[in-house]
Amino acid sequence: MNNGSILNCVICAALFSLLAVGMAAAQQKNFTDDNFPAQGGDIKITFIGHGTLMIAYAGKVIHVDPVSMYADYATLPKADLILVTHEHGDHLDGKAIQAVTTSRTTLITNQASAKNLSGASVMQNGDTRTIDGITIDAVPAYNPDKQFHPKGNGNGYVLTLGGKRIFVAGDTENVPEIKALKDIDIAFLPMNLPFTMTPEQVADTAKAMKPKILYPYHFGETDTNELVRLMGGEKDIEVRIRDLK
């Protein structure tokens, strides 16, 4: 078996495991959320599961990596904006996207995801767009030394809304482009091996970018207590653990 076949087997096995967990999670109707005071009203972030979020602000709804295994999207609010970080099945789901899409929905993806979707607007690493007063910066998301997430393919996104900057990293490691980000109020950083970061790498990233609030997400069975321990000396960074396995 060649390296490419082995890689595909690893990814498929991981996604199958996530599907098994997610099918049960999707039956859950009540998701938790946090609210953040902002200019023009509160920002509400709802924690759907794994790498999937819903953000509401000033009457606008943003779905990030909507995936049916984590929620029944037919019951969730329609989207003004959908962001897809990359094309893996635990981040890209055409059925979920269709369920929350209307004629006024803007769908933003990376190039590889757009091949599987109609009506997608592509953002490349480094691109910036403003939609309905929300500024979106596409940030590189990749593994430097592994094939799971090649450089130049996936996006993380910095959203600027209500005077706040929210960073959703996508699947990445502690790469220089992310560590160089500044003035981040809320950061979602992935924490699971072999696809993204160890707790040590998440702590390294957070200590460099210094978000006011850090959420580990996409963390599977990784011990979140280890991250809390590693961040114990960072008095200006609040670590919040939510149900984002």
Which residues does each PLM region occupy?
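Bacterial N-terminal signal peptides that target proteins for export
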Residues: 1-13
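Bacterial N-terminal signal peptides
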Residues: 10-22
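Core dinuclear metal-dependent hydrolase active-site scaffold
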Residues: 27-77, 120-182, 242-245
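Active-site metal-binding motif and surrounding structural segment of the metallo-beta-lactamase
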Residues: 63, 68-113, 182-188
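Active-site environment of divalent metal-dependent phosphoester hydrolases
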Residues: 70-72, 88-92, 114-116, 127-129, ...
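A short acidic, amphipathic alpha-helical/loop segment
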Residues: 95-100, 177-180, 201-205, 227-230
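Binuclear metal-ion centers of metallo-dependent hydrolases, dominated by the metallo-beta-lactamase
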Residues: 121-130, 203, 207-245
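Metallo-beta-lactamase
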Residues: 158-209, 215-222
